[in-house]
A protein has these predicted regions:
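Short beta-strands and strand-coil junctions in structured, solvent-facing domains, enriched
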Residues: 5-9, 66, 91-94
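Extracytoplasmic juxtamembrane/flexible linker immediately downstream
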Residues: 1-50, 76-78, 113-135
Length: 135
């Protein structure tokens, strides 16, 4: 039977400490933030790329280590896992999406989903994306 890849994330309530949101932008830029933003606390969006050192892979590895340490300390339960939400902007490329899915596989991310980017997130990216188009 067909299994909705987003269903696993829908069925589990994301814990703020386990959430990593990845926004695929233009010019192979990868924006990301941790946690779950609210109206009163917008996210702090950071920028990286698909590069061997210091890229999105290192961000994912760091998040997985952080969650593992919190599990070991008892702060998180045994079933709590990193959950990566992948969102593509209209200016991102198919290759970037494939590369991001490869990163999920390489890093053995237990829970991830491809979801639509929100209008609010597009607003957050308006300035960094405008800067990306400048030579």
């Amino acid at each position: 039977p067909f299994k909705d890849p987003n269903q696993q994330v829908k069925n589990q309530q994301l814990k703020e400490s386990c959430a990593l949101t990845v926004l695929l932008g233009s010019h192979h830029r990868v924006y990301y933030y941790t946690g779950i933003p609210t109206e009163t606390a917008p996210p702090t969006i950071k920028t990286t790329y698909f590069k061997p050192n210091g890229g999105i892979r290192d961000i994912i590895i760091a998040k997985m280590k952080e969650v593992a340490q919190r599990k070991a300390s008892g702060e998180l339960g045994a079933k709590d896992n990193v959950a990566v939400l992948i969102k593509a902007t209209p200016n991102s490329t198919y290759k970037d999406m494939v590369d991001m899915l490869d990163e999920m596989n390489i890093n053995e991310v237990p829970v991830f989903a491809i979801v639509d980017i929100s209008p609010v997130e597009l607003e957050f990216l308006a300035v960094p994306e405008a800067d990306a188009t400048k030579p």
